[in-house]
């Protein structure tokens, strides 16, 4: 269990970044975190990783208040991993397999176990075809998959994804969505922070909407996005499938493929 209860956080310069924020990562398998720039999404990620300690309120990990000791934070970060928007921030080796294996080798895991776990996660993210390719020759999307593999290799339970589809072409975005859904089907809990509203609508089953460091609203994905007034108040826009439903009278579809199947058109 990973959640926050009424946490607030103020930076040293006096800026209030979070105010009375409560989120529960057990609310869904894939949870969306949305809000305009400066709404507190990145700061909240740092709270969930134990990098910053709240000024008020509590972060709960595995049913207990998080203790900010070296031992407690080590245990947290073995189970909660982040994948940054820019994969180059967390890829340090020129060889894909060595990069993914880095954390395990640093922990003294046996080489046979390292090889088995690296092979497993590279298969999960569809990176086996380029596992021996020098990192500098990988595409941006391939680097993102390597970064996810590096997070998964520790047998992470909770995965925090910062803008997972940013900078990807349509095929790359489709592959990333398939990876996220595959991970969720395997029992991983995923929190996605993104400005890609259509992605959040299609892939998430629960959403938290932030505004000025506070939770403006939360709930099942469709119910959150149907409330146009809240969307506008947060400085966001509705997903196109919601707009078609509310403005053109189409049935409410959760996925693009379902809409095109209904209209008799084919999409890739």
From Swiss-Prot:
Query: Can you say what this protein is called?
Result: Putative ABC transporter ATP-binding protein lmo1207
> What SUPFAM superfamilies does the entry give?
P-loop containing nucleoside triphosphate hydrolases
Keyword Transport appears in the UniProt entry: yes
> In terms of domain of life, where is this protein from?
Bacteria
Q: Where is the ABC transporter domain?
A: 2-237
Positions with a binding annotation for ATP: 35-42
What's the stated role of this polypeptide? Probably part of an ABC transporter complex. Responsible for energy coupling to the transport system.
| InterPro entries named among the record's database cross-references | AAA+_ATPase, ABC_transporter-like_ATP-bd, ABC_transporter-like_CS, ABC_transpr_CbiO/EcfA_su, Co_trans_ATP-bd, ECF_ABC_transporter_ATP-bd, P-loop_NTPase
* Locations listed in the record: Cell membrane
Query: A single GO molecular function, which one?
Result: ATP binding
Regions crossing the membrane: none
Q: Name one GO biological process term.
A: cobalt ion transport
Q: What cellular component terms from Gene Ontology apply here?
A: ATP-binding cassette (ABC) transporter complex
**What is the top EC class of this enzyme, as a single word?**
translocase
The EC number(s) given in the record are 7.-.-.-
Recorded topology in the membrane? Peripheral membrane protein
Name the SMART domains for this protein.
AAA
Q: What is its main location?
A: membrane
């Amino acid at each position: 269990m990973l959640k926050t209860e009424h946490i607030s956080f103020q930076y040293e310069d006096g800026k209030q970044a979070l105010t009375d924020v409560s989120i529960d990562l057990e609310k869904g398998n894939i949870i969306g975190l949305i809000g305009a720039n400066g709404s507190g999404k990145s700061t909240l990620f740092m709270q969930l990783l134990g990098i910053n300690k709240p000024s008020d309120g509590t972060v709960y990990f595995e049913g207990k208040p998080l203790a900010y000791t070296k031992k407690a934070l080590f245990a947290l970060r073995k189970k909660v991993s982040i994948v940054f928007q820019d994969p180059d921030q967390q890829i340090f080796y020129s060889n894909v397999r060595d990069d993914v294996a880095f954390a395990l080798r640093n922990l003294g895991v046996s080489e046979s176990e390292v090889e088995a776990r690296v092979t497993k996660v590279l298969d999960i993210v569809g990176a086996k075809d380029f596992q021996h390719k020098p990192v500098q020759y990988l595409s941006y999307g391939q680097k993102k998959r390597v970064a996810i593999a590096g997070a998964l290799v520790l047998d992470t339970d909770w995965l925090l994804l910062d803008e997972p589809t940013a900078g990807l072409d349509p095929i790359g975005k489709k592959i990333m969505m398939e990876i996220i859904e595959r991970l969720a089907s395997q029992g991983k809990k995923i929190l996605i922070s993104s400005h890609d509203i259509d992605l959040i609508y299609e892939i998430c089953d629960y959403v938290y909407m932030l505004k000025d460091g506070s939770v403006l609203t939360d709930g099942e994905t469709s119910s959150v996005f149907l409330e146009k007034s809240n969307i506008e108040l947060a400085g966001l826009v509705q997903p196109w499938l919601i707009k078609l439903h509310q403005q053109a009278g189409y049935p409410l579809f959760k996925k693009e493929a379902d809409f095109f199947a209904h209209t008799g058109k084919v999409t890739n």
